[in-house]
Amino acid sequence: MAIEGVLQEGFVTTTADKLINYMRTGSLWPMTFGLACCAVEMIHAGVSRYDLDRFGVVFRPSPRQSDVMIVAGTLTNKMAPALRKVYDQMAEPRWVISMGSCANGGGYYHYSYSVVRGCDRIVPVDIYVPGCPPTAEALIYGIIQLQNKIRRTNTIAR
């Protein structure tokens, strides 16, 4: 039965989990944490050619207004405490997308003394987007995967 048939009867039944997760997937507000060249591709995903707004994704300037952090680029030891501080300022529930080889595991600079070998050593990561740099399409695919992950989670503890 389609949703139109249910609406003609005057009511719709669902669970609170599905309703809450549906609302969360349609209003992801990421905060950009651009550290290197991957940030340029992240900007490409926000312009009119790819238009992240159609997925309900609106970039926010403040961590207190965001529920998704996109870490794009090489994370250094000096920048790691700032990343953790920004992550801690985000409201719950919060998710992290690691974008690019450098954010995923250090990338080309993996053996450098000043590079953190993956941002998952500082903050918990939900989605990894591979590439050097990953394309805007890859980031959009990662955001869609995050939306699917949010739909599968249980919001209300039982």
Swiss-Prot record:
[4Fe-4S] cluster binds at C37, C38, C102, C132. It is a peripheral membrane protein. It catalyses: a quinone + NADH + 5 H(+)(in) = a quinol + NAD(+) + 4 H(+)(out). It is an enzyme of class 7 (translocase). The gene is nuoB. This is NADH-quinone oxidoreductase subunit B. Belongs to the complex I 20 kDa subunit family. NCBIfam families: nuoB_fam, PRK06411.1. Binds 1 [4Fe-4S] cluster. HAMAP family: NDH1_NuoB.
